[in-house]
Amino acid sequence: MSSTMSADQSNRARPVIRIKENPEDFTVEEVADIPKSDNGKYTIIKAEIIDWDTNRIVEEIASALRISRKRISYAGTKDKRARKIQYFCINAPVDVSVLAFKGFRIIDRFRSDHYLRLGDLTANHFRIRFQGASDDYIEQRYEKMMECGGFPNYFGQQRFGSRRRNTHDVGRLIVTGRYEDAVRLYLYDERYDIEDYRREFIETLDYNRALEKFPRTLRFERSIIGYYAQHHTFKGAFDALPKNLSIMFVHAYQSYLFNRMLSLRIEKYGLNRAIPGDTAFPVDRYFNPDKSRPVEVNEVNVDTINQLIERDRLRVALPIIGSEVGPDQSDFGEIEKKILEEEHVDRSMFRNSEYPHLSSTGDRRIVSAKPVDFSVSNSVMDFTLGRGIYATTLISTFGDLVDFDAESDGF
């Protein structure tokens, strides 16, 4: 085992596991079944992308093809500091061979009548080089984790931002109707930001100076400053961002609420125990839930449900609170309600009549998962996870994670 330990970790024997010291150390490849059609309406490209944020690469593709970014879709967002094999769908008659820039390479291209949407994946395959722990240690922790029924399906830390881990805090302000405060926190958060130009703009609102000082790489922040220059108010400033980016703040806050609920759920009932009033879903081998077939747990079927959970046929799913998804009817639902009371929010607040694109209906997320085809050799972990399940969350069960993906892109 590595001797890389923090002082208070030595007694717990949890190593500090470091990943992404180089982007090529973290490879994620989308597993998708996209039907091909010679005369299909859409162009699908499969690309290798290194050290690009998903939203920024979409902007680059759109710019190179001279089309709106709205004509480009993808199945999943990925970490910036990584090597990604990712699919994109282009709804325009364009020549994709012109796409040539650093860190981007087309592996395959074909036509399809299938329009690619977020979540149109079977799984993600990961190959991750790590430091700070031995292969034997990782193997032992993996076996223990599998014996315990898998790992908690928390949203990963990147959901809440990279260096500036405040995306959910901005989302909380949006949900509670404090739009101007939300914009201010996005532009400058004293907990994380040391750049004078951020602080100076919030203090002076001198947008001309801010547009001179804010680096052009911070294009989303600059878009908001440009909005303020035109309207002299922060209210409505999130309209200056692409809609899929502005809703990320709300989704991050929902993820924060889910993680709080899951943590208390494990503390009270353990990882995989179903109780009457729960909702469970059938899962496939990658732990993708079939949400079209919910199973309501009651006093009669609870023992059978727990047996099916042990056999990895079912998983309990907690609510991702939204306008159409509220706390459960189980005993644990009372704890879920208490969390919302502490946050001073309720489900109705996720329906935003003033800015409908910042509304979220909510969802459900399974409480645990397992990696598929896991192996470790020469300080490289190799495994596959279902869609929306975070590799960083899995690795965090093995040790205290240090993720070098610390580039600030505002999210």
Curated annotation (Swiss-Prot):
Q: Which PROSITE patterns match?
A: TRUD (PS50984), UPF0024 (PS01268)
Q: Keywords, A to Z? A: Isomerase, tRNA processing
Lineage at the top is: Archaea, Methanobacteriati, Thermoplasmatota, Thermoplasmata, Thermoplasmatales
tRNA processing is among the record's keywords: yes
Q: Which organism is it from?
A: Thermoplasma acidophilum (strain ATCC 25905 / DSM 1728 / JCM 9062 / NBRC 15155 / AMRC-C165)
Q: Which InterPro entries match?
A: PsdUridine_synth_cat_dom_sf (IPR020103), PsdUridine_synth_TruD (IPR001656), PsdUridine_synth_TruD_CS (IPR020119), PsdUridine_synth_TruD_insert (IPR011760), TruD_catalytic (IPR042214)
Listed name of the protein: Probable tRNA pseudouridine synthase D
Q: Write the Enzyme Commission number(s) for this entry.
A: 5.4.99.27
* Domain TRUD as annotated: residue spans: 150-369
Does the keyword field hold Isomerase? yes
Q: Which family does it belong to?
A: Belongs to the pseudouridine synthase TruD family.
Classification via Pfam families:
TruD (PF01142)
**Which PANTHER family would you find in this protein's record?**
PSEUDOURIDYLATE SYNTHASE PUS7L, TRNA PSEUDOURIDINE SYNTHASE D
**Which cysteine pairs are joined by S-S bonds?**
none
